[in-house]
Amino acid sequence: MSASGGTKAIVAALSANLAIAVAKFVAFLFSGSSSMLAESVHSLADSGNQGLLLLGGKKAKREATPQHPFGYGRERYIYAFLVSIVLFSVGGMFAVYEGYEKIKHPHEIEAWYWPVGVLIFAIIAEGFSFRTAIKESNQTRGALSWTEFIRRAKAPELPVVLLEDFGALIGLVLALAGVGLAIGTGDGVWDGIGTLCIGILLIAIAIVLAAETKSLLLGEAAGTDQVEKIKAAVVDGDTVTGIIHMRTLHLGPEELLVAAKIAVQHDDTATEVANAINAAESRIREAVPIARVIYLEPDIYNEAAARSGTNPAKNAAKDAKGPAEEAPDAKGPSDPTETSH
């Protein structure tokens, strides 16, 4: 997922949310609607969240240092996680509290045309922002469903903006329904119920965001397609005959670490093995350009021994030397290759 695409969606969402937040707050001042107050805080929180995403993207571009040798790519994950915290606390909990207070102490909505007009304007503005996020996401989504895209995306910006914009549109519909029922019935309780529903919605979205960004912070492997490309690139059929085991890890959305133990011929010289490793690294980077950090460890692998036990190197040494001697332990191919969830 390109960083530029994510930035475009973030800027579009930030511009829309700032304008909407001001309009909603003005509508609250004239009407006294708690739904409008909750929605204005919601839009303000969303604006702050987009600012956090932009800040995280900027910090992630810093060069690696001796203290952080793998760079700062995970800054984008950290700031995306902060977004979920802000959405939960500032947006969700405030709306729940405001809704509860309005249900407990209801009052009629004054100057009803202000909240109705602003909500219609906000739905249109959020619709344009949501459309931009969908358009940018479709460039990288491929054949994935939207649920799979959000779960598997390694760059957090677009999934965050998608969920925020989707939540904003649903929240606006809930606010419009609450205000409409309050105006139609003359009972301000409906305004409070709409506000309460908005808070519950924001909390639910915040929990989903927190779960997904937590997985990225813990460290996710490359996607299945990328793993298969790496496997195909490593083996040349001459010096490198196979992969004993391999691990991949995203150091950031666009930085991948690859570590593998590879099988080489037992009679190859050190120079031949070194040249084969360098060639394999070049093939990996060509197949998967985001593979920035690559560690390949050569080892001797015996296929016949692999079929006879779980430790092929050790079993092969036993067959050659007899029961009196044992070769040093070496890992076999029993470790599965990791893929993303």
Residue ranges, per PLM feature:
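Alpha-helical transmembrane segments and adjacent TM-loop junctions that form the membrane-embedded core
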Residues: 75-319, 329, 335-341
